[in-house]
Amino acid sequence: MSEPTSSRPAYARLLDRAVRILAVRDHSEQELRRKLSAPVMGKNGPEEIDATADDYERVIAWCHEHHYLDDERFVMRFIASRSRKGYGPARIRQELNQKGISRESTEKTMRECEIDWSEMAREQAVRKYGEPLPSNFSEKVKVQRFLLYRGYLMDDIQQIWRNFAD
């Protein structure tokens, strides 16, 4: 199968760029498309790649076919990474939505990940406010606000005081 010489270099450059991007960390398909379409910094400033839409589609298909690009694997690793950093399910869902991951895929993976979000919320609260957790109303509100900002659900936050009474 012979390709035109003008599209071969653009395709090859795109493919090389995609592999380099995916070698650093997993990306969603939407993230990879955005990064591939962004101008490349050359010696004389930003340079556009003269690739066609077909070149982009072929590169994405090649990455899927060779398992460089896998949205399901990306979602699993992203959830694990963000939960280790102390973020809750609401914030993780929002970030995955921004990265172009479908709600169904996110929900399916969140169910499979088996993370105890109320325990994670408690760990974050203890890390920030110390043990024992505050019991007066105004201090509890501060803890709740902090955990809501981190993306935890109100049910998980309320579990802290229900299950872990002093």
UniProtKB/Swiss-Prot annotation:
Location within or outside the cell: Cytoplasm
Biological processes annotated in GO: regulation of DNA repair
This protein's GO CC annotations: cytoplasm
Protein's recorded name: Regulatory protein RecX
Keyword annotations from UniProtKB, A to Z: Cytoplasm
Cited Gene3D superfamilies: Winged helix-like DNA-binding domain superfamily/Winged helix DNA-binding domain
Chain's role: Modulates RecA activity.
UniProt family annotation: Belongs to the RecX family.
Highest taxon of source: Bacteria
Species this chain originates from: Salmonella newport (strain SL254)
Main subcellular localisation: cytoplasm
